[in-house]
Amino acid sequence: MKNEMLALILAGGQGTRLGKLTQSIAKPAVQFGGRYRIIDFALSNCANSGIHNVGVVTQYQPLALNNHIGNGSSWGLDGINSGVSILQPYSASEGNRWFEGTSHAIYQNIDYIDSVNPEYVLILSGDHIYKMDYDDMLQSHKDNNASLTVAVLDVPLKEASRFGIMNTDANNRIVEFEEKPAQPKSTKASMGIYIFDWQRLRNMLVAAEKSKVGMSDFGKNVIPNYLESGESVYAYEFSGYWKDVGTIESLWEANMEYISPENALDSRNRQWKIYSRNLISPPNFLGANAHVEDSLVVDGCFVDGTVKHSILSTGAQVREGAEVLDSVIMSGAIIGQGAKIKRAIIGEGAIISDGVEIDGTDEVQVVGYNEVVGVATDED
């Protein structure tokens, strides 16, 4: 049976710009917003868009990510005719199959894709925060009779040189692609979201592999190849909230935007929920000295200090006399008595000992997973 569209989430990047936060886990597994991991947004978008088959392409430090996704039940992707498949590099008779780039990762999983037998493939990045109806993008792809549709976001001209820029005609057909141009001709930035006709993409990838032509990356190789070949390539304009959280600063900003009164992500929209694998935790406990304002405090937290404009993830502790301001405290982290945290991201299971001060006024500070800052006490 032919499935209409298969989603493939690229989740194998190392995420070196997130520093300590990705030393032991893949970037899409990094926590966000108190109860989510970054990949939850792509998975939830798939579920809400009616996509029933999803492949997650992993490579770097996949254990936490694999455990989080499980069988896909948290996103309703564990039915008879639906499912999530974890796609990791493996050795084959022809040798090593380590992924060399985004499109190469797709080529290496041709057998899996063929087994699903889709008419279209949706390529997604696993490290962006946004809500999108992929079905609407697919309809645009069909209406344009396109071979490839690229989701684009209008960005300020001064920021356009940071992105792959799509130059289009009056009908939104892409006529030129520029990778991080010094002097951009337009402000339509690629979001790294693509819909391909599968057979056309498959034929191109197989031919490139046979001829040993480098075709490892969608932005650098595949899109230019499609344009040079005269394929019909169109832009799909997206106007909602979208954030690339590939740096410490952008991850911190996205978390702060998430708890802002405006909340452009519209996290409380019951018509488009963000799902996650949530463990059962006890209720929060607020001690006699607790003072919490303008903050998001998730299940299982213990607070006996001051928390302002911050996020406390599942099971975090802020002990007596501690102060947390403009910060993200990830699951299980402990902020000791009298400690002061400002503009920081504290990783899962980290311990900030009594009296320690972390000040990110000039630059957002990061404490890694299970890292101990200061001298931990027996209580920790």
Curated annotation (Swiss-Prot):
Keyword Transcription regulation part of the UniProt annotation = no
One MF term in GO for this entry?
A: ATP binding
Binding-site list for alpha-D-glucose 1-phosphate: 164, 179-180, 190
> What does it catalyze?
alpha-D-glucose 1-phosphate + ATP + H(+) = ADP-alpha-D-glucose + diphosphate
Enzyme Commission no: 2.7.7.27
Q: Which PROSITE patterns match?
A: ADP_GLC_PYROPHOSPH_1, ADP_GLC_PYROPHOSPH_2, ADP_GLC_PYROPHOSPH_3
Any one Gene Ontology biological process term?
glycogen biosynthetic process
- What protein family does this chain belong to? Belongs to the bacterial/plant glucose-1-phosphate adenylyltransferase family.
Tell me how this protein assembles. Homotetramer.
Q: What does this protein do?
A: Involved in the biosynthesis of ADP-glucose, a building block required for the elongation reactions to produce glycogen. Catalyzes the reaction between ATP and alpha-D-glucose 1-phosphate (G1P) to produce pyrophosphate and ADP-Glc.
Q: Which NCBIfam families match?
A: glgC, PRK05293.1
Protein's name in the database: Glucose-1-phosphate adenylyltransferase
Give the species this sequence originates from. Answer: Streptococcus pneumoniae serotype 4 (strain ATCC BAA-334 / TIGR4)
